[in-house]
């Protein structure tokens, strides 16, 4: 059905997450280890529960910079005009057991888990993952994407309803 299907995380050493996944019985469904040192793994959505999760490393010391090397974008993207109009700052997972899923992801991703009201959150340097309980659903899924709009003119040109837009069944919250 309609929902987001993949979350991609960039890190310094994707191979360490691949090893950790094996210890946690999280299966991979795709692996890539390129000659230039780029490594990536897609983890099975039934083991991650809710999405295909990809953990990628680019063999680039500046990997934490917004405009650093990204293998999957091709050879020219760093030469293109930069778009600073918006930034992705979070996602929301709808879960039939938010406590269990958030604890599993916290353990796997090495991100701190905090509880704010009845929402479990994983917090990183520049994004967060929210886990919302919905006991009426059969499957966990990515329901919302949080986007910070940095350019007011760009925001004014969008068809915004209730502080967001909907694309393929995923509500994109604009902050």
Regions flagged by a language model, labelled:
Residues 12-25, 97-112, 153:
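Amphipathic alpha-helical segments
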Residues 74-117:
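Surface-exposed interaction/gating patches
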Residues 8-10, 92-94, 146-150:
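Short hydrophobic/aromatic beta-strand micro-patches
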């Amino acid at each position: 059905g309609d929902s987001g299907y993949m979350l991609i995380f960039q890190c310094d050493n994707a191979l360490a997450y691949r090893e950790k996944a094996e210890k946690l019985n999280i299966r991979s469904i795709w692996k890539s280890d390129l000659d230039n040192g780029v490594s990536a793994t897609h983890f099975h959505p039934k083991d991650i529960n809710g999405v295909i999760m990809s953990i990628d490393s680019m063999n680039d010391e500046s990997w934490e910079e917004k405009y650093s090397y990204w293998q999957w974008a091709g050879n020219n993207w760093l030469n293109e005009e930069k778009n600073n109009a918006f930034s992705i700052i979070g996602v929301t997972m709808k879960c039939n057991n938010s406590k269990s899923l958030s604890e599993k992801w916290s353990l796997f991703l090495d991100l701190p888990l905090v509880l704010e009201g009845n929402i479990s959150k994983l917090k990183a340097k520049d994004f967060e993952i929210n886990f919302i309980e919905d006991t009426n659903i059969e499957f966990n899924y990515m329901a919302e994407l949080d986007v910070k709009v940095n350019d007011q003119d760009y925001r004014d040109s969008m068809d915004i309803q209730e502080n967001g837009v909907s694309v393929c069944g995923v509500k994109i919250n604009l902050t």
